[in-house]
Amino acid sequence: MQYKDLRDFMSQLEQRGELKRVAAPVSPNLEMTEICDRLLRANGPAVLFEQPRRDNGDIYKVPVLANLFGTTQRVAQGMGASSLEDLRDIGRVLSVLKEPEPPRGLREAGKLFTLAKSVWDMAPKRVSSPACQEIVWEGNDVDLARLPIQTCWPGDAAPLITWGLVVTKGPHKKRQNLGIYRQQVISRNQVIMRWLAHRGGALDFREHALANPGKPFPIAVALGADPATILGAVTPVPDTLSEYQFAGLLRGSRTALASCITPTLSELSVPASAEIILEGHIQPDPNHPSGYQHALEGPYGDHTGYYNEQDWFPVFTIDRITMRRDPIYHSTYTGKPPDEPAVLGVALNEVFVPLLQKQFPEITDFYLPPEGCSYRMALVRMKKQYAGHAKRVMFGVWSFLRQFMYTKFIVVVDDDIDVRDWKEVIWAITTRVDPTRDTVMVDNTPIDYLDFASPVSGLGSKMGIDATDKWPGETTREWGTPITMAPEIKARVDQMWGSLFEEGPGK
């Protein structure tokens, strides 16, 4: 599915019946969450709330787009694919770009050249009069209360920006980083930027603070970017490829970029077709140990299904807001699976498989069950080749992609087990695992800060479960042989099946 920008994508969805408009007034304070939660659980359409209602009954001038990625099919379409299965092709492209191999012949050389040319052809282009700057708010006009920002759950601390595409650049880096981090509104022009220590934005900020102490850190936030750019920011793109270039590959057209208006943000480029852009800085604060303004964030209902603990994060002060005419505010909520992050996880799972198989050819399938909060549990199917092989694969998965450093549980099974069928996985665990021999415990590893089950915030343990058949060296006992029916008997019963239960004459 090809499209120009978010509006074009929405138009195509609406033509297919995958986007519905809600004309009735609906509040972004809790009501939208409940509506979208019901829609998502029913595999329902994306929704455009045309009249977001304030608490006093007034109507916001900006409509709200929600549940955009509420089905894996729409995620696939957003990534330029026609189906979930086609996402594996994207994974194969990324695996080649991540670790290209020397061609083994002219045909492979030609394919590699074609791929390289297609990547080169998708270099972003500059736009001098971008749609995202048709309207500009400055000074006292900068007021986040003018936007219909959702409050998702009853215990949430404040309205929360959820789909903001955060653009940063480290002082020693040539390329920008795109990341999606939630942002708590704390005043008319300030939000708390909740990025974890390992994320690209936090790393850029840390480098800036070391290289330029006491100087404001520039940030731009794009709201309502096109789906390819949004999804490119959560995909494991090789460091040699910019997310904007990758978005062009997905979309089938070069990403149009614009420079920020604020002079101190001149090095940051934003999607020219985005609906809304926030421009500003993290300001210095000599009274804080980091040297920069921080505030206590949360609590918020999160993808774990719980409210998270409060913690200190940088404050982003917004100097200027630019937008398209008649802008659309793109929003979501997170909660106990299923939610949009869980749906994204199922879709991106198909991108991960070829990347893993490039590094570990013995892996035949890989699955992140949505019940595992997107990434906390991984199920791996493999062709085992030697004793201890399953444990090697466990450690390989934990260390291969940054996304898997927070995976708490890995279960490895043989190639005869369908990792997408819980019944088979549980059968393998209960019949092929000895708890002492076949579990691997690793202490003091990185853990999601939202995981309150860990003894220390951000640091906890991992468990690997080897649910494969055991080879000599792993057991001294004779291993069991699975029960299977003889093929000729199954074929014979297939032939007679239709007549077995027919009622005869007189019955």
Swiss-Prot record:
One of the record's GO molecular function terms: 3-octaprenyl-4-hydroxybenzoate carboxy-lyase activity
Where does the record place the catalytic residues?
A: D302 (proton donor)
Could you tell me the keywords of this UniProt record? Cell membrane, Decarboxylase, Flavoprotein, FMN, Lyase, Manganese, Membrane, Metal-binding, Ubiquinone biosynthesis
Q: Where, by residue number, does prenylated FMN bind?
A: I180, Y181, R182, R194, W195, L196, R199, G200
Pathway per its UniProt entry is: Cofactor biosynthesis; ubiquinone biosynthesis
Name the Enzyme Commission number(s) assigned to this protein: 4.1.1.98
Q: Which GO terms describe its cellular component?
A: cytosol; plasma membrane
The protein's topology relative to the membrane is: Peripheral membrane protein
Which cofactor does the UniProt annotation name?
prenylated FMN; Mn(2+)
Binding locations of Mn(2+): N177, E243
Any note on cofactor binding? Binds 1 prenylated FMN per subunit.
Q: In which compartments does the protein localize?
A: Cell membrane
Identify the domain of life: Bacteria
Keyword Metal-binding in annotation: yes
Q: Which family is this sequence assigned to?
A: Belongs to the UbiD family.
Query: What is annotated about its quaternary structure and interactions?
Result: Homohexamer.
Q: What job does the chain carry out? A: Catalyzes the decarboxylation of 3-octaprenyl-4-hydroxy benzoate to 2-octaprenylphenol, an intermediate step in ubiquinone biosynthesis.
What's this protein's name? 3-octaprenyl-4-hydroxybenzoate carboxy-lyase
Q: Which organism is it from?
A: Cupriavidus metallidurans (strain ATCC 43123 / DSM 2839 / NBRC 102507 / CH34) (Ralstonia metallidurans)
